[in-house]
């Protein structure tokens, strides 16, 4: 079957799961500013995101309702209306870019980053570094009780080893008495 006049990538799914996949990817892109996905999915998601941002430039109630019907996530629609559309107000289109990053090891699918053109990678890495520092501090605080738990596990293992040795000795005694009888 030829693919003439086909407008939709089917992604080997029925319409419901396909819509859910695209809605999820659009929401993730709006929330994080950059997502990693396959090239075909990135191209399809780019269509939807760019149409949504262009619609959001109108800024009226009917546009908000239209976006909510397409993407039922209220936070994502609010981000489109209040953040993304004003940010790209002077840009006539092309709000996203696709950066190919090679092939996925498992199935060799071609992977890509889909990100907004003004995505600030350095700021995101700085935020990530701050979060990792905070998590390191909380991990140190959690290690103190963990040491107690480790000591408790060690004593439990010692008791289990003693019980195992006793059972082994009992088994030998039974075997010896059975051999005598």
UniProtKB/Swiss-Prot annotation:
Molecular functions (GO terms): structural constituent of ribosome
Query: Does the keyword Cytoplasm feature in the UniProt annotation?
Result: no
Superkingdom assignment: Bacteria
Q: Which UniProt keywords apply?
A: Ribonucleoprotein, Ribosomal protein
Record bears the keyword Ribosomal protein: yes
Chain residue ranges for the region called Disordered: 129-181
> What cystine pairs are annotated?
none
GO:BP terms for this protein? translation
Q: Name one Pfam family in it.
A: Ribosomal_L17
GO cellular component terms, semicolon-separated: cytosolic large ribosomal subunit
| Entries under Gene3D superfamilies matching the protein | Ribosomal protein L17
How does this polypeptide assemble, per the annotation?
A: Part of the 50S ribosomal subunit. Contacts protein L32.
Q: Which family does it belong to?
A: Belongs to the bacterial ribosomal protein bL17 family.
**Name of protein:** Large ribosomal subunit protein bL17
* Species: Bdellovibrio bacteriovorus (strain ATCC 15356 / DSM 50701 / NCIMB 9529 / HD100)
């Amino acid at each position: 079957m030829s693919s003439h006049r086909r407008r939709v990538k089917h992604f080997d799914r029925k319409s419901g799961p396909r819509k859910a996949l695209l809605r999820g990817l659009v929401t993730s892109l709006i929330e994080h500013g950059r997502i990693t996905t396959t090239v075909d999915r990135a191209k399809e998601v780019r269509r939807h995101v760019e149409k949504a941002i262009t619609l959001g430039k109108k800024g009226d109630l009917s546009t908000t309702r239209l976006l909510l019907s397409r993407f039922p996530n209220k936070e994502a629609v609010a981000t489109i209306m209040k953040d993304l559309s004003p940010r790209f107000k002077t840009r006539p289109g092309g709000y996203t870019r696709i950066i190919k990053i090679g092939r996925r090891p498992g199935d060799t699918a071609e992977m890509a980053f889909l990100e907004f053109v003004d995505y600030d990678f350095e700021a995101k890495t700085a935020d990530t570094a701050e979060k990792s520092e905070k998590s390191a501090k909380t991990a140190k605080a959690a290690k103190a009780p963990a040491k107690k738990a480790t000591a408790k596990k060690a004593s439990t293992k010692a008791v289990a080893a003693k019980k195992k040795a006793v059972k082994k000795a009992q088994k030998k005694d039974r075997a010896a008495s059975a051999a005598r009888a």
